[in-house]
Amino acid sequence: MRVLILGSGVIGTTSAWYLSKAGCEVVVVDRQSGAGLETSYANGGQLSFGYTSPWAAPGVPLKAVRWLFERHAPLSIRPTTDWNQYVWLARMLRHCSAERYAVNKSRMLRLSEYSREALEALSAETGITFEGRRLGTIQLFRTQQQLDAAVRDIELLTQYGIPYEVLSPHQLAKFEPGLVDGSVRFAGALRLPHDQTGDCYLFTQRLAALAAKRGVEFRYGCKVQRLEVDGPRVTGAWINGALERADCCVVALGSYSPLLLAPLGLRLPVYPLKGFSLTLPMIDASRAPVSTVLDESYKVAVTRFDERIRVAGMAEVSGYDVSLNPRRRATLEMVVQDVYPGCGDLGRGEFWTGLRPATPDGTPVIGATPYQGLFLNTGHGTLGWTMSSGSGRYLADLICCRPCEISSEGLDMFRYLVSTIPCPQECAPCVPPTP
């Protein structure tokens, strides 16, 4: 089977890897000059398998109103003329109930835990390195109210058998001694000892190189113009003015996926959630994080690589704008100075932004569509790095008609019922096109 993958971020690249291993002929196209140069380039570096949570959570609507007036708000909204922005926000608000939060988090945990297993197996098989650390993640709570609110997450962690530790302020220093030098006295923390860290860009680049050795063809500098449709089937894509035919097309274009699908009558509720990062040269290892921490108040993570510190987070709903907002840099600098003062050189920091493809419920969209031969792997939001290996392996099983190792419930686009065309029975999510 010839598979055409549109997008060479971490999602497209892991999809290519697993489809190649399944025996498919794989071609990957991307508009950039190499793999992982957009949203995968400088994300937070956290492999948050256990911390996985949707942004749509109880209390967020009221917090969002308050955040409108805060300089360092973790979530901000910049109105645009795009009606999709308001439709997406309305859908997200509907998922902020405790009931929906539990359902969505459960789906996300299912995929994240599977992704942990997939990455472990991939790493053991290939020996791939990406400045990874297996020292856990710590969620920091500045207030007792935040700590108390973590109870609902702890209940789901217990349900899924995910190890965790609730840390007192005194216990924090055992795992992250550098916090002692900070100006914040935290109320407590939640530690997930099995979570990991690593550079997503390094992983994507190196996995692409390994996939190329297996015969996967990567074509860069390619503009994907539209999908080719023949009746109920997608038969390829127009790229740089030429038709590239394939038995199966995988759309892994992140936030840009809905733009390609719209002409087919598919209204995919994926919208860009703009994130920011600041990468600092490490100047004092004793003041740096041992692994990674997430400041719950600002939704900012501070992560250690070999010789660098990555400070990343926040979310800005502002359409497809990729300009660098100096106020967001100020927030990142404030947080790292609060928690790990003197760990990195702020003067030489690399400020970056990326558009994270978010769904209203937080769960990505992986699987079949109403069109035969067209599959999706997109909408991972802030957790593309975390979910990438599991998403790629799961998708390869679907496309190649192999039994999936996890439930497909709630993972494909049919949960939204937003297509303007009927879904053919032979193209149900659990019945991929015949190879």
Swiss-Prot record:
Entry keyword set: FAD, Flavoprotein, Oxidoreductase
InterPro entries hit by this protein: DadA, FAD-dep_OxRdtase, FAD/NAD-bd_sf
Catalytic activity of the protein: a D-alpha-amino acid + A + H2O = a 2-oxocarboxylate + AH2 + NH4(+)
Highest taxon in the source lineage: Bacteria
Any one GO MF annotation of this record: D-amino-acid dehydrogenase activity
A single GO cellular-component term on record: plasma membrane
Binding site for FAD: 3-17
Cofactor dependency: FAD
Keyword hit for Phosphoprotein: no
An individual GO BP term: D-alanine catabolic process
Pathway: Amino-acid degradation; D-alanine degradation; NH(3) and pyruvate from D-alanine: step 1/1
One family name in Pfam for this protein: DAO
Function: Oxidative deamination of D-amino acids.
Family: Belongs to the DadA oxidoreductase family.
Entry protein name: D-amino acid dehydrogenase
Protein's organism: Xylella fastidiosa (strain M12)
Gene responsible for this protein: dadA
